Amino acid sequence: MLTSVKLEVVDLVEDLSVLISWVRFNRPKLEAGANFGVSVQHDVLSNLTSGRNSAISVYQSIANYYFSRGRVIRKMQKNVGIEDYRRSVLSLDVKQFVEASQIVADLRSIYLMLADKLFKNWKYVEAPKGSKQERQSRSDFYM
């Protein structure tokens, strides 16, 4: 299960990195007035970055689990007769399974939140300055 979760986390980080780069390259320079679309684009960019950072921390927590498990197993091999080390490994595995289930739910939430933000504000992300008519009606920005 952790292998597939790790692959999903890696996919999310890669997808968000591409989106972050795309938004950054499409961001015009700030000028006086008519920067509403740019501010929307900046808000979306900060959400993308936050989602990417969350995914990276999830990946690091999975790596920490493997390190902790290996450390306990090494102690278990040195002290073969102590049952508490076996229980510790089992407890660590159960804890990680619960965390992995939560990670999957968190990944889903990150994808949904970012998709919602992007779909609702796509015209501002794609063309933040827009045409003169679009600049006059900026009341349809969704948070």
What are these regions (language model features)?
Residues 1-143:
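Long, contiguous alpha-helical bundle segments
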